[in-house]
């Protein structure tokens, strides 16, 4: 084929796996790898709060309208700031119950899918480089990933082993 990889931002993350619907199967069937950007979904997967951003848009009461105007993507009717914050906080609570961090889970999750060849992580210091390497290398137990799937916190089609 004419493509060997694509860069995908924010659509195959611990929070949002919408690329499983169409893009991932196309890539898999055509031996196209994905390089993922935005694995922290604009920061919500570091520290979910009403001050967080998702899809480069602040998660306040105007999130839906502001995202629509930004042309990053058109949100679906069920989406709202509350929807995404609740989901992120539910995943964060699951992380805490397994004595881990949301950031560590967000770094490890994409690599279970064999279509993903690499992830681009935003960092601004050498300490963050070291932390991210450590977060990747300290593997979370399969029971954690199964818990996320069993509780519908990640798409059932997500690869977790």
List PLM regions with ranges.
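Beta/alpha (TIM)-barrel catalytic core signal, keyed to glycine-rich beta->alpha loops juxtaposed to Asp/Glu
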Residues: 1-160
């Amino acid at each position: 084929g004419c493509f060997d990889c694509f860069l995908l931002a924010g659509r195959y993350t611990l929070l949002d796996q919408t690329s499983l619907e169409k893009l991932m199967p196309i890539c898999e069937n055509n031996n196209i790898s994905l390089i993922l950007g935005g694995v922290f979904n604009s920061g919500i997967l570091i520290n979910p709060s009403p001050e967080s951003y998702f899809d480069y848009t602040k998660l306040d009461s105007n999130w839906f309208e502001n995202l629509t105007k930004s042309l990053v993507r058109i949100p679906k009717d069920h989406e709202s700031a509350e929807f995404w914050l609740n989901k992120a906080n539910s995943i964060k609570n699951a992380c805490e119950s397994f004595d881990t961090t949301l950031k560590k889970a967000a770094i490890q999750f994409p690599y279970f899918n064999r279509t993903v060849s690499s992830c681009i992580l935003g960092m601004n210091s050498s300490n963050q480089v070291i932390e991210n390497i450590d977060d990747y290398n300290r593997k979370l137990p399969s029971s954690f990933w199964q818990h996320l799937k069993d509780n519908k916190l990640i798409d059932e089609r997500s690869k977790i082993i």
